[in-house]
UniProtKB/Swiss-Prot annotation:
It is found in: Cytoplasm. It holds the Pfam family Autophagy_act_C. E2 conjugating enzyme required for the cytoplasm to vacuole transport (Cvt) and autophagy. Required for selective autophagic degradation of the nucleus (nucleophagy) as well as for mitophagy which contributes to regulate mitochondrial quantity and quality by eliminating the mitochondria to a basal level to fulfill cellular energy requirements and preventing excess ROS production. Responsible for the E2-like covalent binding of phosphatidylethanolamine to the C-terminal Gly of ATG8. This is Autophagy-related protein 3. The active site is at residue 238. The gene is ATG3. Residues 85-167 are annotated as: Flexible region. Its main location: cytoplasm. Residues 242-319 are annotated as: Handle region.
């Protein structure tokens, strides 16, 4: 069933005509031109990301420039698998985080990390002597009696196992962001590698995906810009536009509230919920000056948005950064350029 869906999905993206009419503010969807603008912004702010061409001209898509077919970042570390021990109780519990009070907005899924239901408790450390007698609680050995691990030598007869179990060991990932004409949103693909540099067997990449998303939000599919068939873990973009629309609306509402408070001479919190998010996004100016680039007459992104109404939006289309929360074990590089 997954093979049929993947084939149909690839054909839809390959043959669906790209729309060049912007509906970003109303739907959260973007055009190919806006995808390129957002990609340029991502590459500018985060140097670990780069544009890349398809491996062969036959794999190129006509709605994107040849040298900007997709975005890629390589050698992204992933040190732990998402097993039962990852992040405490991650994978055991989940909760839907609702929208604001009296809000009709949908919430989002938060998996794991519910410390209130599984509080961590410190356990007493107790010792056992050679006769098998358990020491009383609170008994503390003399520090001089505690063996120094640095003085212990490894037994030459012991074979050291570097794997440390079935689900451990560091991996690296290459992350790819493409444009989907069918969904009119970005789409992410991931290709994993073993510590020795060999590509992971496709199903092993699912060990780094949150359980509820496996084979639903994330499936194994061929990367469309490679000359040969290479299976990657692909994050479906079907809910990306609605989620972005909700984020845009909330950020705009926070910006409006912030301006109303400033106009009334009231103190504005520096990091309060979505209002704090809006403030941080505004600081992501291409010029790096920390000012609202929509007000800068020399802003190199002026060709993306010209309307005066842009001064009343918290997130511009070129700041449309792709967000993925289904891979918490993959350590994305958020180092920003200056």
């Amino acid at each position: 069933m997954n093979i049929i869906y993947s084939t149909v999905n690839s054909l839809r993206d390959r043959y669906t005509p790209a729309s060049h009419t912007s509906t970003f503010r109303n739907t959260g969807e973007i055009t190919p031109e806006e995808f390129v603008a957002a990609g340029d912004y991502l590459v500018f702010k985060f140097p670990s990301w780069t544009w890349s061409d398809a491996e062969t001209p036959a794999k190129r898509v006509a709605h994107l420039p040849p040298e900007k077919q997709y975005l890629v970042t390589r050698n992204v570390p992933c040190h732990r698998r998402l097993n039962d021990d990852f992040a405490g109780d991650a994978g055991h519990e989940e909760a839907v985080v609702e929208g604001g009070k009296n809000s009709g907005d949908d919430g989002w899924l938060r998996t794991g990390g519910l410390a209130s239901s599984q509080p961590l408790k410190a356990r007493d450390v107790r010792t056992v002597d050679d006769a098998g007698n358990v020491a009383d609680r609170g008994a503390i050995d003399d520090e001089d009696d505690i063996p120094d691990m640095e003085e212990e030598e490894d037994d030459e007869a012991i074979i050291q196992d570097g794997s440390h179990g079935k689900h451990s060991g560091s991996r690296t990932y290459s992350l790819y962001i493409t444009y989907s004409p069918w969904y009119k949103t970005p789409r992410m693909y991931m290709l994993g590698y073993q510590p020795n540099g060999q590509a992971l067997i496709p199903h092993l990449m699912m060990e780094d995906i949150v359980g509820d998303y496996k084979d639903k939000t994330v499936t194994l599919e061929d990367f469309p810009f490679f000359a040969t068939s290479v299976k990657t873990a692909s994050i479906h973009p079907c809910k990306h536009a609605p989620v972005m629309k909700t984020l845009l609306d909330r950020a705009d509402a926070a910006l409006k509230l912030r301006k109303e408070r400033q106009k009334a001479g009231l103190e504005v919190g520096s990091n309060q919920g979505l209002e704090g998010l809006e403030a941080q996004v505004v600081k992501l100016a291409v010029s790096g000056t920390g000012t609202d680039v929509a007000n800068d007459a020399n802003d190199e992104w002026e060709e993306v948005q010209h309307d005066a109404a842009d001064q009343d939006v918290a997130i511009r289309v070129d700041q449309y950064l792709f967000i993925a929360s289904v891979t918490p074990g993959i350590e994305h590089d958020f180092t920003m350029g200056v």
